[in-house]
């Protein structure tokens, strides 16, 4: 009797172990994806999340992170995957000075090589150059004969008119942001004329005519929507900011299939997996302006936009 009970208990324990084991196989494929706190990042974060979930992963998405917090999460191993920008990595994370004239391909190669030494694998790039830009209403630029950032710098320095300027708080302090821009173009925004706020607040400020000059990103849909003037970066201050999935080497060692999965995503964008050209980069910016417009102008949710894109490009079933 004791032997029968012991056998029965052993069978129950074995079945329990099998059941738990099966559950662990699914649960073991757990990935944490992080994204920053603006529209484009919400969309790419959802794209990565939904695509990996479709391929059998359990994904936790950690949104709304500032650049330093996202990087800290990657370095601590709390976040496995993010989509970072080449210019941000080169100047902020790797603390290099950008040399004007380094193109999209060169900068990607430099970042990829150095990040490999830090334990991060940079996969195929998405050529969209979401670089910082300064914009104004077209009539303000026309009235003051402004075309380039050099023209704008001269207007600041002349002091004949107040140029109310609105930039993101992070941009106002980061090493590749406003302080370096002012030094490069040799101008200064008076403290009384400078406003800072959360990402997107500068666009709202310009839309409402609360400022004359606002910080934007190259893929912001609202620029085309309102026909705003974008100041030419005639002294080549801003480095390329191309979007690239970055994966922890440790998680890629465990799940090497992630590389092919995310490279499939990059391949759906203009020039994905190929060397960048100005034409391909411009096409990529246009694609992302449209995607961002679906959220910022059509008021769709980022997860809807991501799902729609993945289905339309055959990456997941509808």
Which role does the model predict for each range below?
Residues 93-123, 210, 222-236:
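Ligand-binding "clamshell"
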Residues 63-67, 77-90, 107, 199, ...:
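Beta->alpha turn/N-cap motifs
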